[in-house]
Amino acid sequence: MADAADSSMALVHSSLADSVLTSPRTLRQGQKWEVEYARYFGTPRRDPTAAPPSGLRYIMRGVHRHQGTWIPASCPASLCVCHPSLPSAVPVLTISIGDVVFEEHFVSILNFSWPQVTCVTQCPIRGSRVVFVSFCDKFKQIQKFAVRFPQPCDAESFLSCVECSCGSSGTMDIIPFGSDYVCEDSSASEYIVSNGLHHRLDDASNLEEQCFDHTIDEPPMNYHEETDQHVLEPLSASNTSNNSAFPPSFNQMLKSCSIDYDQEEPCPLAASNHVLQEVYVLDTSHDVANEERTAGKGMDAAEGVDASILTYDLMARIKTYMADESFNDMLLKLDKAIDELGGDMSL
C-alpha cells in the first residue's frame, strides 16, 4: 500500500510539472530581432508656483518643442513577436534587455509608423531602419517607443510579421518622405527626426563640434608677405632731445623730416641723371660737407643739371640719414665725444 501511495504521489507531481511546462506562455513561438530601443517620456505638468526639487530645474516651454524627450537604451535590446499556440490568443510584442522586460503589449492595440527616407533626389524612396510604435494606456495617455534595426530589410521583415500576426485589426502607418526626415547611414547618431529617436553623444564629440563651429576669421596671408613694418620710422622724442646741444636749425630739420617725409613726392629728374648717380655713390662715408660743396656750385654747364634739383636731393638724403638708426647712433657718439672735450661746438 505504501508503494501504491508513493506511485500515486509521483503521478500527481508529474502531472503538475507537465501542466506548468504546457502553459500558454511557454508554447509561444515567434521571431526575434536585435534592435536599439528608446522610450519617449513626456514632460509632466507642473504648478508654476511650486519650486523644483533640489538639484533640478524646470525646462522652458520654448526649449523643448514636443514637451518630452527620447531616452535610448545603452545596450542592444531583443524584439520578439510571439505567436500563441491557441487560435483564440492574440500575438504579443515583447522588448527585453537581458532578463528585464521593458515592453510587452498586444500587437492588436499598437500603432506602427514607418518613415520613408531617401539619400539624394536621384535615389528612390525606401523604408527607414526606425519604426515608431504608439499605444494608449489605461490613463488615456499616449505612450510611444521606437526601435532601430540593423538594416532596412530587417525592419521590413518585422512589419511583414506584424501585418501577418494582427491581420486587419492592427494599424499600420507608412509615413511619406518629408522635411522631418533625412537620410540615415550606419552611424547611430546621424539619424535626425523632429519627433523621433535622438541618440546621446559623448562629451568628447560635443567638444569637438564646438571647436569646429567657432573659428577665427583672419585674412589670408601670402607666403612671401611680411608683417607691416615701416622701413623709415619717425624719430622718437628721446632722440631729438639728445641732440639739443646742436644748433636750432639742425634740431628743427630733425623734427620736420619725420613729419614731412611721407607727404613729399619725389621731384622729377632732368633729362640726364649722371650727376645724381655720382652723388648716390658718394654716400657711403656720410660726407655731408662734400655734398654741400657739390650742391653749392650752382648750374653745372657740362652736365646741364639745375642746382635746385641737387639741393632738393641733398635734403632728401639728409632726411633719410636722420631716420636711420645707425646715423642717430653716430650723432650720439659725436655728442658724447664733444662733451668729453669740454662741450665746445667750435671744435
UniProtKB/Swiss-Prot annotation:
Mention any one GO cellular component term assigned to this protein in its UniProt record. Answer: cytoplasm
Per the record's keyword annotation, is Cytoplasm included, yes or no?
Answer: yes
The keyword Aminoacyl-tRNA synthetase appears for this protein: no
Q: Main localisation, per the record?
A: cytoplasm
Q: Which GO terms fall under biological process for this protein?
A: homologous chromosome pairing at meiosis
Where it sits in the cell: the answer is:
Cytoplasm
Knockout phenotype, as recorded, reads: Male and female sterility. During meiosis, synapsis is uncoupled from recombination and pairing in the mutant gametes.
Q: Which UniProt keywords apply?
A: Cytoplasm, Meiosis
Record's function text:
Required for accurate chromosome segregation in meiosis. Required for pairing to occur between homologous chromosomes. Acts in early recombination steps and ensures pairing fidelity and proper repair of meiotic DNA double-strand-breaks. Regulates recombination and pairing of homologous chromosomes during meiotic prophase by controlling transport of RAD50 from cytoplasm to the nucleus. May affect pairing of the gene-rich fraction of the genome rather than preventing pairing between repetitive DNA elements.
Specify the protein name.
Answer: Protein POOR HOMOLOGOUS SYNAPSIS 1
Organism of origin: Zea mays
